[in-house]
């Protein structure tokens, strides 16, 4: 079995989007998205979009529980295929809370989603502070210092944040933007 290339998956998803609306799917749009999910069950953007559209669309001849079961399966598949990404976990958490009346599971999914998003934010901020620090212009050093202050408040225990902020402060002091620490 040959696997679809990424550009093919994106093109098929674009064609499916053009066959309907973002707020209520056409039968052709749902068919195209389902075919893509069948052909590439790990393509998370399609799984999430199909699940979202199914929640917004009343399909003729499909009872509510049947639709909810398909949506739940798609969301669980998206969570698994995405390596438990924050967006997929968040969608499953909302679904579980609203449609499955399972507050304990919903809470755990919301917490896992938040923790995943925070890890991504911490790493993104550390990378951005480091990038700006390495640019070594007054403007980028000032941006690094400003973001560093926020990052330290949000992630006070993060060794990575503490390291890049300390480096930014050292370079800013050498550039005359901060008083030098004379140890």
Kindly label every feature range from the protein language model.
Residues 1-4, 139-183:
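Terminal, low-structured helical/coil segments at or just beyond the last alpha-helical repeat
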Residues 2-18, 39-60, 83-98, 120-134, ...:
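Amphipathic alpha-helical repeat scaffolds of TPR domains
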Residues 15-25, 55-68, 96-106, 132-143, ...:
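Short coil/turn connectors between adjacent alpha-helices in alpha-solenoid helical repeat scaffolds
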Residues 30-34, 69, 76, 111, ...:
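Alpha-solenoid helical repeat scaffolds
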Residues 39, 81, 115-117, 154:
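Structural marker of alpha-solenoid helical repeat scaffolds
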Residues 64-88:
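Helix-adjacent hinge/juxtasegments
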Residues 74, 112-121:
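Long amphipathic alpha-helical scaffold regions
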């Amino acid at each position: 079995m040959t696997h679809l290339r990424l550009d093919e998956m994106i093109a098929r998803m674009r064609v499916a989007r053009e066959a309907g609306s973002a707020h209520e799917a056409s039968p052709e749009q749902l068919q195209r998205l389902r075919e893509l999910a069948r052909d590439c069950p790990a393509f998370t953007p399609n799984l999430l979009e199909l699940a979202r559209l199914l929640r917004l669309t009343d399909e003729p001849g499909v009872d509510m529980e049947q639709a909810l079961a398909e949506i739940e399966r798609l969301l669980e598949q998206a969570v698994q295929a995405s390596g438990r990404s924050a967006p997929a976990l968040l969608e499953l958490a909302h679904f579980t809370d609203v449609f499955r009346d399972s507050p304990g599971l919903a809470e755990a999914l919301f917490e896992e989603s938040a923790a995943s998003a925070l890890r991504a934010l911490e790493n993104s901020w550390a990378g951005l502070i480091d990038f700006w620090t390495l640019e070594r212009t007054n403007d980028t050093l000032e941006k690094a210092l400003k973001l560093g202050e926020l990052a330290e408040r949000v992630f006070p225990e993060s060794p990575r944040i503490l390291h890049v902020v300390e480096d930014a402060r050292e370079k800013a002091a050498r550039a005359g933007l901060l008083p030098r620490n004379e140890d």
